[in-house]
């Protein structure tokens, strides 16, 4: 887009409004380079980035970015083979730190869906080794001792030598106190010296470095410290050389990544600029507009960003509308309206938010041209009319259907009749070429043109006749009218004179009356529209409040659920811990019978939470209510899925049952009755597939391959219980070889179990060390 329009509309001043919100020099540079584009994809991307950043601020209202300096020149020097100094390394260090902070922020971000911004966050590089290398430089511009072993060694020697010098000088201060003008150690030419009285200068051997202005004091470096000082000077030179070597070495390490670091700095600046745009939105109640690709413009309550206390106005430039002609007197805000339209378009096409209400739409124009203000060329000695016409002629040769044209006081500066005719002819040419134009004029002849011509609309700026002041409110569809008679009357002009004047232009008065009626209708419509907007705003506020309340309730609900889960988990952990202790006690009592161990385990398992199908529970409860159990009934033990028979009922309401070879004591809720006519096998609680063979009597096999350790141990425990209930003499456990963790767990479990007679690996042809055969006690 041409630079002249940006200067005319003062776009640089608008961009300056965003500068206070920037934190990085990279962001500032990108802001200054910002210019409007006609590429829809670029504009859409900028709009999407702002919307995502707004959503990010909702979840992270204090999101910030560490300040960084421009490093483009530093990276360029690296690529050219130059070595960096400490200050330049500190700039790179800051960029790497900022990049790492942003990556960490993005990794921990929750409840926000990002697409466009995610691309930038994910393009940031991570250089942990380089960050470690750059830690050698502290923020004070000092190379740390750990930068190299040699540097640390040299500095230790310097420290030791300086300590020796101090000790020697302190001793001399005490010994030669009467020969000194002051009891202090002074410094001259980088050397430690004593302030000796001139009369004793020959009493202290050493090098004279200075004499006081009075000649009474001679600054002598004692011979005892001269050699040490020379050693220190030599060590200082070694230190400087080693620091240069470190700078060269780290420069070589950073050099291959110069382009990536420069790119990271650009991304940091880009994120900073997006953040600044959203901060501007929050500060100025700006919006991200919708984008119309058919040049339709709809601006709701739009304001000029550079005008203090600007009046908000609505502008609608439909797809078929080619021209809006603003008529009426000067000083009413017509020029500001032109600039507001143009500047809003420039801001939007530059990817910036606009000062308008939600629902506003902007078009896309390849060029925006303007002839605004007095651009008279003094050098060419042209008149105002000639200057404007020269500019318009140039513009007419450049505009096309993809342009927006802004014309201020079209046809002014010449004979009113000829000026009006020229203005209409120019507007007609633009209309036929379908070029969107907003023009201002004070010629009344253009009112008729706006009324009679298709795709052209009149507009005006409201004037308050009561206060004799413009209101700066834009009235689209209503042509401007003359207020001369009303103003003259209010200023005290005789009513006779005003009446005589009005009779001379009765026809114009009729037009003014029509315009006045249109103004009243427009004002009434505007009031209704404002009321509707107020209701919409209230609804929006209510919706936001409800949404916020809903989210807060959900968060509170989730928090309470998490607390409940944690408390439940603590209870379960305590119960399981108690159960482990009970089991240890049970196992330690070898006289207990197998069925007593199994019954105890079944009760302990009830302590652990288990997912329950409530609907099935209701069905089971209804089924139980159909008939009370009695002695001799067949039952299914719910804990194991085993069938048995009720043998007797105890006084406390519990039942004794024969389950296989084991007698068990059960509560009524722990079993289900089996219908006498039901011949189908009861569906057991599935633990693992049990395979029976007829080779050595009843056998079972448990396959633990592919299981997690905890899952495998739980299944093993249940499987052994079932084997004991079924009175099995021997079972096979397949655990595989793998890492050996499950195999070791199986071995430890079997060693602890008092009912295991023996166990060992299967024969080689039956699984070898990948399977264990277990034999139970008789």
Swiss-Prot record:
InterPro entries noted in UniProt: DNA_mismatch_repair_MutS_C, DNA_mismatch_repair_MutS_core, DNA_mismatch_repair_MutS_sf, MSSS, MutS, MutS2, P-loop_NTPase, Smr_dom
Record-linked Pfam families: MSSS (PF20297), MutS_V (PF00488), Smr (PF01713)
Residue span(s) of domain Smr: 702-777
Keyword Cytoplasm assigned: no
Keyword DNA-binding: yes
Keywords: ATP-binding, DNA-binding, Endonuclease, Hydrolase, Nuclease, Nucleotide-binding, RNA-binding, rRNA-binding
Any single biological process term in GO: mismatch repair
Binding annotation for ATP: 328-335
Enzyme Commission number(s) of this protein: 3.1.-.-, 3.6.4.-
UniProt xrefs under Gene3D superfamilies: 3.30.1370.110, P-loop containing nucleotide triphosphate hydrolases
GO terms for MF: ATP binding; ATP hydrolysis activity; ATP-dependent DNA damage sensor activity; endonuclease activity; mismatched DNA binding; ribosomal large subunit binding; rRNA binding
SMART domains for this protein: MUTSac (SM00534), MUTSd (SM00533), SMR (SM00463)
Summary of subunit composition and partner proteins: Homodimer. Binds to stalled ribosomes, contacting rRNA.
Family listed: Belongs to the DNA mismatch repair MutS family. MutS2 subfamily.
Function: Endonuclease that is involved in the suppression of homologous recombination and thus may have a key role in the control of bacterial genetic diversity. Acts as a ribosome collision sensor, splitting the ribosome into its 2 subunits. Detects stalled/collided 70S ribosomes which it binds and splits by an ATP-hydrolysis driven conformational change. Acts upstream of the ribosome quality control system (RQC), a ribosome-associated complex that mediates the extraction of incompletely synthesized nascent chains from stalled ribosomes and their subsequent degradation. Probably generates substrates for RQC.
Protein name listed in UniProt: Endonuclease MutS2
Name of the gene: mutS2
């Amino acid at each position: 887009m041409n630079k002249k329009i940006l200067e005319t509309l003062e776009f640089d001043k608008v961009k300056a409004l965003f500068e206070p919100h920037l934190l990085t020099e990279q962001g500032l540079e990108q802001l200054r380079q910002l210019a409007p584009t006609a590429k829809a994809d670029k504009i859409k991307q900028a709009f999407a980035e702002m919307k995502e950043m707004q959503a990010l601020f909702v979840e992270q209202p204090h999101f910030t970015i560490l300040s960084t300096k421009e490093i483009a020149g530093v990276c360029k020097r690296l690529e050219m083979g130059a070595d960096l100094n400490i200050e330049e390394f500190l700039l790179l260090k800051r960029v790497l730190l900022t990049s790492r902070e942003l990556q960490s922020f993005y990794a921990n971000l929750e409840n926000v869906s990002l697409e466009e911004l995610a691309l930038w966050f994910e393009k940031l590089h991570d250089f942990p080794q380089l960050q470690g290398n750059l830690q050698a430089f502290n923020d004070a511009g000092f190379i740390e001792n750990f930068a190299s072993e040699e540097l640390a060694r040299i500095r230790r020697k310097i420290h030791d030598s300086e300590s020796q010098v101090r000790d020697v000088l302190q001793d001399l201060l005490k010994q030669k106190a009467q020969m000194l003008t002051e009891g202090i150690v002074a410094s001259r030419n980088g050397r430690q010296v004593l302030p000796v009285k001139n009369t004793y200068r020959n009493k202290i051997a050493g090098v004279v470095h200075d004499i006081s202005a009075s000649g009474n004091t001679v600054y002598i470096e004692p011979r005892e410290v001269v050699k040490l000082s020379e050693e220190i000077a030599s060590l200082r030179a070694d230190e400087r050389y080693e620091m240069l070597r470190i700078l060269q070495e780290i420069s070589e390490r950073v050099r291959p990544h110069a382009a990536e670091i420069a790119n990271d700095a650009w991304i940091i600046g880009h994120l900073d600029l997006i953040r600044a745009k959203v901060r501007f939105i929050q500060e100025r109640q700006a919006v991200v507009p919708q984008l119309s690709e058919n040049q339709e413009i709809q601006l709701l309550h739009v304001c000029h960003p550079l005008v203090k206390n600007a009046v908000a106005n609505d502008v609608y430039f439909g797809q078929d509308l080619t021209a809006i002609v603003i008529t009426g007197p000067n000083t009413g805000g017509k020029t500001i309206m032109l600039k507001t339209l143009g500047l809003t378009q420039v801001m939007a096409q530059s990817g910036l938010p606009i000062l308008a209400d939600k629902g506003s739409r902007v078009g896309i124009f390849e060029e925006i041209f303007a002839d605004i203000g007095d651009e008279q060329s003094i050098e060419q000695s042209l008149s105002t009319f000639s200057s404007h016409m020269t500019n318009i002629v140039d513009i007419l040769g450049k505009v096309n259907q993809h342009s927006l044209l802004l014309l201020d006081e079209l046809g002014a500066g010449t004979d009113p009749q000829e000026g009006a005719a020229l203005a209409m002819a120019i507007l007609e040419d633009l209309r036929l070429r379908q070029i969107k134009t907003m023009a201002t004029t004070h010629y009344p002849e253009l009112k008729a043109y706006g009324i009679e011509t298709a795709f052209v609309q009149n507009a005006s700026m409201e004037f308050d006749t009561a206060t004799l002041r413009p209101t700066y409110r834009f009235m689209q569809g209503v042509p401007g009218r003359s207020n001369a008679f009303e103003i003259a009357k209010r200023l005290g002009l005789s009513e006779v004179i005003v009446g005589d004047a009005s009779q001379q232009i009765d026809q114009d008065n009729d037009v003014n009356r029509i315009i006045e009626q249109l103004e009243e209708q427009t004002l009434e419509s505007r009031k209704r529209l404002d009321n509707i907007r107020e209701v919409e705003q209230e609804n929006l506020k209510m919706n936001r409040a409800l949404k916020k309340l809903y989210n807060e309730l959900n968060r509170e609900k989730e928090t309470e659920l998490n607390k409940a889960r944690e408390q439940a988990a603590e209870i379960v952990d305590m119960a399981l811990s108690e159960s482990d202790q009970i089991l240890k006690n049970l196992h330690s009592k070898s006289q207990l019978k197998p069925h007593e161990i199994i019954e105890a385990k079944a009760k302990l398992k009830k302590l652990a939470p288990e997912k329950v199908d409530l609907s099935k529970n209701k069905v089971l409860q209804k089924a139980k209510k159909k008939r009370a159990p009695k002695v001799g009934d067949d039952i299914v033990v719910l804990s194991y899925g085993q069938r048995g028979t009720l043998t007797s009922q105890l006084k406390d309401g519990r039942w004794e049952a024969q389950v296989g070879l084991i007698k068990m004591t059960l509560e009524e809720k722990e079993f289900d009755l089996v219908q006498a006519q039901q011949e189908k096998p009861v569906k057991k609680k599935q633990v693992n597939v049990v395979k029976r063979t007829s080779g050595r009597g009843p056998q079972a096999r448990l396959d633990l391959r592919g299981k997690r350790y905890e899952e495998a141990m739980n299944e093993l425990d249940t499987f052994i219980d079932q084997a004991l209930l079924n009175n099995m003499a021997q079972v096979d456990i397949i655990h595989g070889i793998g890492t050996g963790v499950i195999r070791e767990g199986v071995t430890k479990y079997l060693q602890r179990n008092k009912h295991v007679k023996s166990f060992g690996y299967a024969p080689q042809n039956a699984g070898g060390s990948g399977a264990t055969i277990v034999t139970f006690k008789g």
